């Protein structure tokens, strides 16, 4: 987790409040900030109490007044403020495995990250989601999530994804339908 501030947008609420590059973002309005979703969700309000750890290790709190929904203006080492989550499946139809060699390396990364689904529209399988992450999707109203399902038969789902634990992703889908907009592509034969 890297919540160390690497840049601050000019004329932003954070710059006006005196936040410094090199400080670490700890909380916004009392909520621990783990990644970009926490940063966006908890920083939405017009009044934000931001807790920071200075380069010397001291902890300080800054109160920021801004427009509702206006970004605080903080930038971090990586966009997600965390590592991208990769796919744990061994799908029989994996398009990444079928790509020719010699292309740019980013094309070979098999992402399966719910945050990228929400932020960028990527499709995920939900197979590497923990109970905590599934609950967080519901709590933060993370929607929409684009899900590749392939089949709703539990045994066939596990076989096609090459993952004996893939069945639980079907449980997450069932549990999420009341709270999250899931995009499920369909194929008609």
Q: Can you say where each PLM-predicted feature lies in the sequence?
A:
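Short beta-alpha junctions and helix-cap segments that line functional grooves
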Residues: 35-39
């Amino acid at each position: 987790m890297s919540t160390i501030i690497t840049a601050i947008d000019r004329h932003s609420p954070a710059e006006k409040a005196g936040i410094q590059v090199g400080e670490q973002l700890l909380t916004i309005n009392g909520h621990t900030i783990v990644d970009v979703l926490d940063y966006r969700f908890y920083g939405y309000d017009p009044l934000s109490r931001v807790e920071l750890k200075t380069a010397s290790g001291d902890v300080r709190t800054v109160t920021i007044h801004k427009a509702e929904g206006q970004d605080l203006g903080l930038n971090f080492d990586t966009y997600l403020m965390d590592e991208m989550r990769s796919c744990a499946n061994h799908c029989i139809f994996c398009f990444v495995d079928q790509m020719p060699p010699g292309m740019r390396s980013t094309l070979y990364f098999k992402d399966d990250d719910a945050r990228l689904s929400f932020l960028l529209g990527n499709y995920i399988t939900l197979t590497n989601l923990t109970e905590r992450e599934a609950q967080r999707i519901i709590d933060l109203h993370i929607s929409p999530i684009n899900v590749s399902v392939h089949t709703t038969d539990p045994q066939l789902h596990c076989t096609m994804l090459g993952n004996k634990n893939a069945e639980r992703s079907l449980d997450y889908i069932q549990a999420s339908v009341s709270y999250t907009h899931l995009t499920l592509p369909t194929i008609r034969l």
